[in-house]
Amino acid sequence: MLYLIGLGLSYKSDITVRGLEAVKNCTRVYLEHYTSILMAASKEELEEFYGKEVILADRELVESGSADILRDADKENVAFLVVGDPFGATTHTDLVLRAKKDKIPVEVIHNASVMNAVGSCGLQLYNFGQTISMVFFTDSWRPDSWYDKVMENRKIGLHTLVLLDIKVKEQSLENMARGRLIYEPPRYMSIAQCCQQLLEIEELRAEKAYTADTPVVGISRLGSPTQSFKAGTIKELAEYDAGEPLHSLVILGRQSHELELEYLLEFTDNKEKFKNDVIADQEYFKPAPWVPPVEEED
């Protein structure tokens, strides 16, 4: 049996009772270690808590060496641990498909993730649209396909959750080209860098999906003891120091509910200004009034 087990957001004890029982019954335990990190627990602490050795599964192992993970899973129990919920990344869906192709039974044990815990910032979950990912820009690569999704969300008044890039056990282009197994230090995108990249792409595309004054909410270390939120404009949060990772961001939709706004005011330095920014943004992105079609005369 292959178990895909969600670990939750932060603590070693965030795993569910059913998930913990499954881990204890597994021969091998893998921890996916490149789409997210467990902020309040180390590998060693997890091993002590589970009473099991934990094998770190980097991108290369999961995407290219899945046969190693699935080895003998038709005869013994193998656990694949994922920070958050198991289906927070398409890679994990692919692992399930490979297991099923090999006739290996699969059981998924869910947990909290940023996709639902984001509601703790005060925005209502059913007012969210498509989620986007913001990657680190390079000199030669500045992807902007996410921009269209932000535009679509904003047109129908929905908030956009932005997941920020992390780089764990990544190689530089030079080391890859030379075949050197030398890895760069871990990097975690900050709220400020995300906002700077948002502004850069809006300037480039100039389609007015948002402006520098569009309200956003910065989320830091969600689910951890030092969880914090910051509400302001994209321009303001482009200079905001949110502290230690992990970070994420929400771009407000143009139809923010009054209860959402009241909640967000607790996270801003200037309540009156933020209120006015929200009102101005809603007017800025207000669609043209609907005009009924002219009926043709007989």
UniProtKB/Swiss-Prot annotation:
The keyword S-adenosyl-L-methionine applies. It comes from the Eukaryota. One of its GO terms (biological process) is methylation. Pathway: Protein modification; peptidyl-diphthamide biosynthesis. Its EC number is 2.1.1.314. GO terms for cellular component: cytoplasm. The keyword Ribosomal protein does not apply. S-adenosyl-L-methionine binds at L9, D85, G88, S113, V114, L164, L222, H247. Pfam families: TP_methylase. GO terms for molecular function: diphthine methyl ester synthase activity. Keywords: Cytoplasm, Methyltransferase, S-adenosyl-L-methionine, Transferase. SUPFAM superfamilies: Tetrapyrrole methylase (SSF53790). Its main location: cytoplasm. It is an enzyme of class 2 (transferase). InterPro entries: 4pyrrol_Mease (IPR000878), 4pyrrol_Methylase_sf (IPR035996), 4pyrrole_Mease_sub1 (IPR014777), 4pyrrole_Mease_sub2 (IPR014776), Dphthn_synthase (IPR004551). It catalyses: 2-[(3S)-amino-3-carboxypropyl]-L-histidyl-[translation elongation factor 2] + 4 S-adenosyl-L-methionine = diphthine methyl ester-[translation elongation factor 2] + 4 S-adenosyl-L-homocysteine + 3 H(+). HAMAP family: Diphthine_synth. S-adenosyl-L-methionine-dependent methyltransferase that catalyzes four methylations of the modified target histidine residue in translation elongation factor 2 (EF-2), to form an intermediate called diphthine methyl ester. The four successive methylation reactions represent the second step of diphthamide biosynthesis. NCBIfam families: dph5. Belongs to the diphthine synthase family. PANTHER family: DIPHTHINE METHYL ESTER SYNTHASE (PTHR10882:SF0), DIPHTHINE SYNTHASE (PTHR10882). This is Diphthine methyl ester synthase. The lineage of its organism: Eukaryota, Fungi, Dikarya, Ascomycota, Saccharomycotina. The gene is DPH5.
